[in-house]
C-alpha cells in the first residue's frame, strides 16, 4: 500500500548563499565627486592649452604688434587658472591617484559588505524562502536506500501463534507493529471449533440475534474449552509413578 502523504525526506532541499550588494550613500557621493573632478580636470586642461597658446602668440610671433598685446596678459592668466583646476581635480577629487590608494579604497567597501550579513535562499519547496543576515544550518536528508520498503512481508507483520493462542517467548511478536489477526489466534482446526460444529452458530441473516439462553450456553462451553486448552497436562501423564 502506498502512502499518499510525502514525508519531509522526499523533498530535496537546496541552500544557496547570496550576498546582495546595496548601494550606499558613500557610493552615490563618489559618483558625484567623479563627475565634478572630471569636469574640473578637462576644464583645467583646456584652459591651460588656451593659456599656452595665447602666451606663445603674444610673446614670440607677434612682437611689436599692438593688436595682440592683450594676449600677453590673458595667456598666463588662463594658464594659471587651468593649472589650478588640474591641481584641484587631482588633489581633492583624486582623479589621478596611485594604485596603492585605489587598493586601500577598494578594501573599505568590501569590509562594509561583509559586516552587513548574507542572504540564504531555500529552493526545492513550494515557495522559496529568503533569510537576510541569519545563521542557517544546512540539512542533508538521508539517502533513499536506507529507508524501509513500503511493501513488507506479512510474516513480519503477524506474530507467530500456537494452536492455543499463546505467544512464544521470542521477541518476534514484540517487534510486530500490527495487532494479531483473529484467524491466527483461533485457527479453524482448533478443538473449540471442531467440537462445537454440532451447534448452529449465527446462521441466517446478519441482523438476526440468538436468544439470551443460547448465548449463555455457548459462552459457558467456550470458557470450559478454553480452560481445557490452556490448562497444562497433569503430572501423572508426564512422569508416570512407579508401581
UniProtKB/Swiss-Prot annotation:
GO cellular component, one term: endoplasmic reticulum membrane
Domain of life: Eukaryota
Annotated membrane topology: Multi-pass membrane protein
Expression sites (tissue/organ): Kidney specific. Expressed in renal primary proximal tubule cells.
Keyword Ribonucleoprotein belongs to the record: no
Any Pfam family: TMEM174
Localization terms from the record: Endoplasmic reticulum membrane; Apical cell membrane
Gene Ontology biological-process entries: phosphate ion homeostasis
Record key words, sorted: Cell membrane, Endoplasmic reticulum, Membrane, Transmembrane, Transmembrane helix
Residues spanning the membrane: 40-60, 73-93
Induction of the gene: Up-regulated by low-phosphate diet.
Chief location of this protein within or outside the cell: endoplasmic reticulum
InterPro entries: TMEM174
Deletion consequences: Tmem174-deficient mice show markedly increased serum levels of Pi, FGF23, and PTH, resulting in vascular calcification. In addition, deficient mice exhibit reduced SLC34A1 responsiveness to FGF23 and PTH administration.
Subunit-level organization: Interacts with SLC34A1; regulates SLC34A1 internalization by PTH and FGF23.
Function: Regulator of plasma phosphate homeostasis. Decreases serum inorganic phosphate (Pi) uptake by regulating the sodium-phosphate cotransporter SLC34A1 trafficking by PTH and FGF23 in the kidney.
Name of the protein in question: Transmembrane protein 174
Organism from which the protein derives: Mus musculus
Lineage: Eukaryota, Metazoa, Chordata, Craniata, Vertebrata
